[in-house]
Amino acid sequence: MQIKINLKVFLFLLIFLITRQIKIYALLMCLALIHEMGHVMAGIILGFKPESISIIPTGFSVKFKNDCKNYNKKIKNGNMLALKKAIIAFAGPFVNLIIMAISIICYKITVISEIAGISIELLIYSNLLIFIFNMLPIYPLDGGRILKEMVHIKYGLFTAYVITNKISNVVVIILTAFASFAILEYKNIAILIIIA
């Protein structure tokens, strides 16, 4: 399995160092790694082999090897393959939900307010944000992948791409409008980094 590093990661590190937010960036990257391991574990359980893991500024991305030697069999079982891909896509956000639930339980029933110097509230909030962001119906985010696979099962691959692309574009336009408003209203340039 190959490990690839996008050079923009170092730019993000520099920005978060300069703004003294490196602790938050480190937390988000750790949570993103755990999130991505959810995809890897689900993929392995469902019979896929991880080909590469890319480290990108906003986290990690795993690519699975698509074995095409039994292509006709895959076409016959296309719906099962699409369902497996949807399960793999949901596995990452599901990991964030589990971490968030455990954090909430720790926060409610114990006196623990920090884990390794990180406040439980920040852990809950970070996992919630990662979950919400990844479940947006924007391809190639997890929500977009799930949408594509579910539409694929019902209407076929071509229609799945068309519908997913249209929904992705609409959601991106809406998010860009909200982000533009937020930048103007709150004068927070960090929102630009999120959009990029």
Predicted features, each with a name:
Residues 1-2, 74-136:
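Metalloprotease/metallohydrolase-associated module, dominated by Zn2+-dependent proteases
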Residues 3-5, 17-76, 122-126, 130, ...:
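Small-residue-rich helix-interface/hinge motifs
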Residues 1-4, 90, 156-166:
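Short, amphipathic, aromatic/basic-enriched membrane-interface segments that mark the entry/exit
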Residues 12-20, 175-184:
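Hydrophobic alpha-helical transmembrane segments
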Residues 107-120, 149-164:
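Membrane interface segments of multi-pass transport proteins and intramembrane proteases
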